[in-house]
Structure formats: C-alpha cells, structure tokens
Amino acid sequence: MNNRGILIVLSGFSGAGKGTVVKNILKTYPDEYAVSVSATTRAPREGETDGREYFFKSTSEFQKMIATGELIEYAQYVGNYYGTPRRYVEEQLEAGKNIILEIEIQGAFNIKKMFPDAVLMFLMPPTAAELENRLRGRGTEDEATIKARLARATQEAEGVEAVSYTHLTL
C-alpha cells in the first residue's frame, strides 16, 4: 500500500481567494494537509513572518537557490521572484501528507511536468470587478501594484487553458 501524499496545486489570480481556501482546508484537516511555504524576494507585508507565510530572500539568495537546484519551480511575478523549495515538499509527500502548493500558472505547468499525478486547481472570482474589489479591499498595495496585478490577471486568463486545471469560482 502506498501512503504517499497527494500534491495539490492551487493557482489563481492575485486576490482570487487562494489564501482563504488554504487556511480553511488546514483548519478543517490539520493532520492530512500541509501547505508548502514558498520563497520570495518581495518584502514582507504587515504581520507576515519569515518561514510562516514565505521564506523572504534577497535576490542574490534566491538566485543561489535556483543555481543549486533547491527549487522545484520558480517564476517572476510583478517584479519579484517566487519559488517552491524542493526538500519540504518531498518530505511531506513521503510522510503521507497531502501538500498544497499555492503558485501561479507558469509554476503549475512546470510542476505538472515533474509530478504528473499532481492535481491542479484554478481559483477565480466570479467577475473582473470582484477581483478588483478584493485587491483594493486588502489595503496592502498601492495603485500601481493593483493595476499591475489586474494586468497580470488578464494575461494569466489567456494561459489557463494551456494547463489541465479543474476550475473553481468563488
């Protein structure tokens, strides 16, 4: 019997509700699921702690992780790098935990190549206006960042069909 965990990739536009979904899964099923903590070069938001929400890295530290093969996938998003550390994911799967990766479309495409059995889910808001409301409602980004995230969402929407996603609207 194989007790290896399932790799679940949750993607979606910034502001689609990925973080909320993940928090509810972990609250409801704490012994069955774990979330991968990504590395990033973006600055921490208020209340975020290194190693909990993200591993916050300098650009040079992140580039070293790329060069030494420490990341399963990585991508640049709105001027910052994001990536998934390999060791933690593999340890959780071997321990029988279902591991959730909250990553963008490009990363999901790369994960599916490396882990063909991974389950891919794409979370989207019901309308573009709702997405903008959610981004503004956070109160964590300036106008330029909100506009960049909305522009990126438009680009990502065009790439969703290239990956075998299950689509979820919240």
Language-model-detected regions and their locations in the chain:
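P-loop (Walker A) phosphate-binding loop of NTP-binding proteins
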Residues: F13
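ATP-binding Walker
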Residues: A16
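ATP-dependent small-molecule kinase phosphotransfer cores
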Residues: S38-I99, Q106-F109
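ATP-dependent NMP and nucleoside kinases share a basic, alpha-helical "lid"
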Residues: T84-R138
